Amino acid sequence: MTLRNDWTREEIQALYEQPFLDLVFKAQQVHREHFTANTIQVSTLLSIKTGKCPEDCKYCSQSAHYDSKLEAEKRIAVEKVISEAKAAKDSGSSRFCMGAAWRNPHERDMPYVLEMVREVKALGMETCMTLGMLNQSQAERLKDAGLDYYNHNLDTSRKYYSHIISTRTFDDRLNTLDYVRQAGMKVCSGGIVGLGESREDRIGLLHELATLPIHPESVPINMLVPIEGTPLADVEKLDVIEWIRTIAVARIIMPHSYIRLSAGRESLSDSDQALAFMAGANSLFSGDKLLTTPNAGEGKDQALFNKLGLTAEKPKPTVSDLSVDAMSA
């Protein structure tokens, strides 16, 4: 399938409106054109600083604006992070993602995160961080330290965005993605479904992602996990079939991207997840927790992989890895 960055909303809507089985069949065909069948990229996500975030994202337990009963934690020691990364690698994860509840990293935090990137990279894992907004200098320093991916989700459509967040703009998010690209890192960016948005908004989110100059290498499709104390605690749950439709459309319009199952997966049955894989999802977060929300544990994931005949993808060597190998040869 030809890679395109000029998808129209009307084309994306037409995909959504296909009969479900036709849509999933098409998505699986596209998936097999560009990826190895029955192989899933596995990532582990660790919170390196939890809670007291100044942003007001209405879905988030870490926001200081809401009483979610979350116990805030200061930055954890680099040694603890490395220990967790080693355990993740031993459990089959090829990528280790580190997240901090910041609006943006302060300069005093940069030596801390840069050391962390270098140490995790030395383990032979792909590295990813989500630290909030970045400026160009910070993006370049993260790249120089060995960061492979930077996550910064768009969350929802531009139209619906102001219903969810007021403390940073949609364009703030796009600017950070631009800095990440300019620095030479790979982009991880997706969104959350089930925020009370309409299908039109889900179309809008995918349209924004699929018309970026370069598609994100990873596209997380989160399902809202309602958290007591947040404004979205009682929002009506999105139908799983609609979530899978979103995954299938994302696969078709961004054929080279990894489509990741992220938050909300712990509430899904094995059959739901199998359908999501059939619809083109080929990445997931493993482990008992995603930052502050529960997640399917590693044991459950391995049991599911065994049941479905899936295997975990091995880390891909980066340009810097190949350069080191050449120097040592």
Swiss-Prot record:
Residue span, Radical SAM core domain: 38-262
Spans traversing the lipid bilayer: none
Binding, [4Fe-4S] cluster: 53, 57, 60
Annotated Gene3D superfamilies: Aldolase class I
One Pfam family linked to the record: Radical_SAM
Pathway: Cofactor biosynthesis; biotin biosynthesis; biotin from 7,8-diaminononanoate: step 2/2
Co-factor: note: Binds 1 [4Fe-4S] cluster. The cluster is coordinated with 3 cysteines and an exchangeable S-adenosyl-L-methionine.
CDD domains given in the database record: Radical_SAM
Catalytic activity: (4R,5S)-dethiobiotin + (sulfur carrier)-SH + 2 reduced [2Fe-2S]-[ferredoxin] + 2 S-adenosyl-L-methionine = (sulfur carrier)-H + biotin + 2 5'-deoxyadenosine + 2 L-methionine + 2 oxidized [2Fe-2S]-[ferredoxin]
Keywords: 2Fe-2S, 4Fe-4S, Biotin biosynthesis, Iron, Iron-sulfur, Metal-binding, S-adenosyl-L-methionine, Transferase
Highest taxon in the source lineage: Bacteria
Swiss-Prot/TrEMBL cofactor(s): [4Fe-4S] cluster; [2Fe-2S] cluster
EC number: 2.8.1.6
One Gene Ontology term of the molecular function aspect: 2 iron, 2 sulfur cluster binding
Binding locations of [2Fe-2S] cluster: 97, 128, 188, 260
GO biological process: biotin biosynthetic process
NCBIfam families on file: bioB
Function field: Catalyzes the conversion of dethiobiotin (DTB) to biotin by the insertion of a sulfur atom into dethiobiotin via a radical-based mechanism.
Quaternary structure (record): Homodimer.
Family label: Belongs to the radical SAM superfamily. Biotin synthase family.
HAMAP family tied to this protein: BioB (MF_01694)
Protein name from the UniProt record: Biotin synthase
Species classification: Bacteria, Pseudomonadati, Pseudomonadota, Gammaproteobacteria, Moraxellales
Gene that produces this protein: bioB
